[in-house]
Amino acid sequence: SEFCKRVLSRQFPDNEFYVIHVHIPTPSKRPYTFYHIGNIMDQRKNFGKILEAFVRLNEPNTRLLVKATCGKDVDVELPRVEVINGLISDYDMDQLHHRADCYVGFSSSEGVGMGAVEAAIRDKPVIITNYGGAPEYIKTPYTIDCGLQELKNDDFLFKKGMQWGDPNFDQLLEFMRHAYSNDVRHMDHEHTRKMTGKDAILREFGLNPTRDVHDDTGKKSS
């Protein structure tokens, strides 16, 4: 630094000093990580299509993180894919969300879609399908169009002959590519936060979240 040059020049006046500034390499960008949480063995989740889209995306600086909630451990032997099996603590689940960048869901139907909702309240970009309950909770430009398809066999509460969503695979790949190419790592989900917040839930139970209530001891609280 110029400071060091001045100090050394005073200390060693017969020498000439030159400043060559320190080179600090630019930190490499961390990999863009897609992630999914759920029972990936359930045909309704269409997890195989998420894997296919990830492979076809074919970007070396991407990762796919999977929290599998299945009856048995699952292995996915593909490069850049990590599977976490078994039950994990709330802390570890929060760390999983922290590690990842974009939540990917491709279900034919969801009552809610808790993985996607939990990602949304953390303001992650979220990809969901436009069938089932998830679009009620999450407003995202990455909402995949769905047709309808008839079930060929029973699937838990869904019976053969019923219909559920037939999500557009090309749109899934398009949204994943857009999120990666534009480095989308944040998305404001105000709608989700309001809908799932304490005040909103209290109102749905007919309670006024701002009024004073009494606890079991008879003491007044607010």
Regions found by a protein language model. Give the residues of each.
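A charged, aromatic-enriched C-terminal amphipathic alpha-helix characteristic of glycosyltransferases
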Residues: 163-171, 180-209
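A short hydrophobic beta-strand element within the catalytic core of glycosyltransferases
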Residues: 103-104, 127
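Aromatic "clamp/platform" in nucleotide-sugar-dependent glycosyltransferases that forms part
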Residues: 108
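Conserved catalytic-core segment of nucleotide-activated headgroup transferases in glycan assembly
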Residues: 29-90, 98-99, 166
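Short hydrophobic beta-strand element within catalytic cores of glycosyltransferases
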Residues: 125-128, 138, 142-145
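Short alpha-helical segment that forms part of, or immediately flanks, the ligand-binding pocket
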Residues: 94, 117-121, 132-136
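Donor nucleotide-sugar binding/catalytic pocket of nucleotide-sugar-dependent glycosyltransferases
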Residues: 1-6, 13-26
